[in-house]
């Protein structure tokens, strides 16, 4: 029975991870005694390897956020505007079908709004 439950947990984790291009999820932690703990940890690409979300730099976190939102948007067929704060730290922003609103620090004395046409 324990082996069946472990295999089922792995299959669930694999099916969820298959929906994400680069983000990987750890949903279960196998215990020494054969038990299983529920967890929900995201691992994202950063510097050529996968690291926990909290250990990644801002650019990696922003792009992982976009990827997660893209997958959920596609699944539910709902595309809402995305707001990204601290985006001045991101050189390459992941593509999205949603409207993307980038908030960036500026030395300008007045609020400035710049628009770009969708590609």
Each model region followed by its residue ranges:
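Conserved ATPase-coupling elements of RecA-like P-loop NTPase cores
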Residues: 90-96
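Glycine-rich/acidic phosphate-handling loop/turn and adjacent ATP-lid/helix
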Residues: 51-59, 90
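C-terminal lobe/lid and adjacent interdomain/linker elements of RecA-like ASCE P-loop ATPase modules
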Residues: 97-119
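Short beta-turn/strand-loop junction motif enriched in small, turn-promoting residues
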Residues: 25, 69-71, 89
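Charged, surface-exposed helical/loop "interaction arms" that form contiguous linear patches used
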Residues: 1-43, 48-52, 77-79
